[in-house]
Amino acid sequence: MKTNLLDFTLPALTEHFAAMGEKPFRAKQVMRWMHQMGQNDFDAMTDLAKSLRAKLHDTATVTVPSLMLEQASSDGTRKWLLDVGTGNRVETVFIPEDDRGTLCVSSQVGCALECTFCSTGRQGFNRNLSTAEIIGQLWWANKSMGVTPKNERVISNVVMMGMGEPLANYDNVVAAMRIMLDDHGYGLSRRRVTLSTSGLVPAMDRLREDCPVALAVSLHAPNDRIRDEIVPINKKYPLRELLAACERYLEKAPRDFVTFEYVMLDQINDRPEHARELVALVRDVPCKFNLIPFNPFPNSGYGRASNNAVRAFRDILAEAGYITTVRKTRGEDIDAACGQLAGQVQDKTQRKVRWLDKGGSTEAGV
């Protein structure tokens, strides 16, 4: 079987080329061709020796997921549906803003964590994505938008906030982020790569040492009682442990704060008393808040908090001194908004079957 070079960080690719009898600078050349010029044809890598190109043809490939569908929203958001084989598809989303362009990248086919308000979670779980399948999303987005080294950068930020829990696919996600950060890869700064986690505490501690990027935490609740219900991983790593891990992470993080994400669910976690409880909860953690209006999907069982409830919640946090934003709902007309990504998952957990047995809908998130 041929080796997919997209799976390699620069050190790993350098080692691979050394085993082929090639000098280290060849690895840098190939990295730039793959990631900066979006090239997956060895014959087009014209500054490589013909003998090396022949070796690569025989032993290697640059294989990205197959593009199945590209959609553009009326607000400029773009979504790509990528086939990763055996009936599984994942989604990645580009969100343009005045001062930046953010790509939301998936890390798994489905998700095993079963957050109750998330469409991806309802689809069940199949497998982790490979490093090539993760970085291939960035590769495709650049390719689709016509990005070249001579163009102005379009994707300025990457957020690991798509399908899946990134820290549950630790090795492949870290390798992909290292490629994003590498000057011979995508050249992003650590401040511009954000990993979002539901709170896998041991992996957060590993990430602090291995590849500290900006951190976002899917908090969504002001106490363990509510969080146990809507983010079940909280039963294993309760809020006290999660917040302590956030404090430890900030010792080496590129930013001096954690972003807490908080989906606003009507009558569940959106009351003024919840906001005040939240202020008390995070008092020892330098942080910002990102309030996320819930994006309904069929038979989700939840409603979106009212605009008045969101404003009142935001004001309580702001008055306590916390920078608080309310996320704009982007790409809703193409199901690209937060919590709507579902792709196509050949579920190994039977979660979808169990959900249907309870009277759910096969339309959830699709």
UniProtKB/Swiss-Prot annotation:
It is found in: Cytoplasm. It comes from the Bacteria. Keywords: 4Fe-4S, Cytoplasm, Disulfide bond, Iron, Iron-sulfur, Metal-binding, Methyltransferase, rRNA processing, S-adenosyl-L-methionine, Transferase, tRNA processing. [4Fe-4S] cluster binds at residues 111, 115, 118. Coiled coil: none annotated. Pfam families: Radical_SAM, RlmN_N. Its main location: cytoplasm. Its EC number is 2.1.1.192. Its cofactor is [4Fe-4S] cluster. Disulfide bonds join 104-338. Binds 1 [4Fe-4S] cluster. The cluster is coordinated with 3 cysteines and an exchangeable S-adenosyl-L-methionine. Belongs to the radical SAM superfamily. RlmN family. This is Dual-specificity RNA methyltransferase RlmN. It comes from Laribacter hongkongensis (strain HLHK9).
